[in-house]
Amino acid sequence: LFLAQNLGLWNGVDPCAGAAPTLSQAQCANTGVPASQYGSISLSPASQYNALYGGNPNLDPEEVDTLTFGVVIDATDNMQFSIDYWDIEIDDVIANIDPELIVNQCATGGDPAFCSLVTRAPNGSLWQGQSGFVTATNINLGGQHWEGIDLAWAWTVDGLGGTWRTDLIGTYMLTKETSPIPTIPSSTYDCVGLINVQCFPTPEWRHTATATYDSNEWWAVTGRWRFYQDVTYDGTADLIANDNIGDENYLDVSAVFRFMDTHDLVVGVNNIFDEEAPLVGGSLATNANQIAGFWDTLGRYMFANVTFRW
């Protein structure tokens, strides 16, 4: 609401820049490009452009409707299964419209509400210096709708002198819709199964499965499988090879050693086969050429920690 406004950077593409712009001269004129500059505006080599971000004192509060229900089944004394459905709808979402979307909506529709937000530098640039930028301060968006199903399964059995435990937790994503522009229903997009400058990677299905053997004495060992279903790139520029990222699988292993009922030593290796994170173009990346915080960006790595109790 009262967040200070300042210039920042957005990742994407200026469709009116470059020797061969993706939009027509008439469309680019809507964004402030005169005929004399069409085809001569420089593209940002880093795919980064200026935007004015910050608060807005005219915001309304968000409104949320949430529906959840689930079932838990104890199939046997040592096996449990649960399924949960959830549906979340948010109206008047407080966020900003993606600057690239603002430029495209201005260009293709000529709506003053969007075109007034695009300020080009004297040379037509949106990235050279600070005089060219897109105003993308917070507003009340149309809304968001997220819907999915969570599944969980667990099984425990005694054997070989210890206890075996297996479990699986997964999410099936049904809907991840955003309506950024209340007055333009066609601007609504669903991110399930996609990745682009507006959609953080959203696999339709992802899960984590673990298997543990506990000696019930001084040690236990655990294996873990993390799975992310493939996502398809949906955008105007080729930022991913073959326009998709295939299924990603990561295997981890760890062991715990217990000493004197007061000390635990845990050692492990995550991503034991050193699977590399998918490479993406600069406008999709959150860190250089990868998407940090989702797929493993470090490759194989080892860890250890010690816990003391008293």
What are these regions (language model features)?
Residues 1-82, 134-149, 156, 201-205, ...:
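Outer-membrane beta-barrel signature, preferentially recognizing the C-terminal barrel domain
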Residues 2-7, 97-107, 182-190, 237-245, ...:
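Flexible, surface-exposed loop regions and adjacent strand-edge segments
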Residues 62-63, 145, 160, 202-205, ...:
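A structural signal for short secondary-structure junctions
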Residues 70-72, 152-154, 254-256, 268:
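Residues within well-ordered beta-strands of beta-sheet-rich folds
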Residues 80, 84-235:
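Gram-negative outer-membrane beta-barrel transporters
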Residues 80, 91, 174-176, 226-234, ...:
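C-terminal beta-signal and adjacent terminal beta-strands/loops
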Residues 222-226, 230-254:
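Generic long, charged, amphipathic alpha-helical segments
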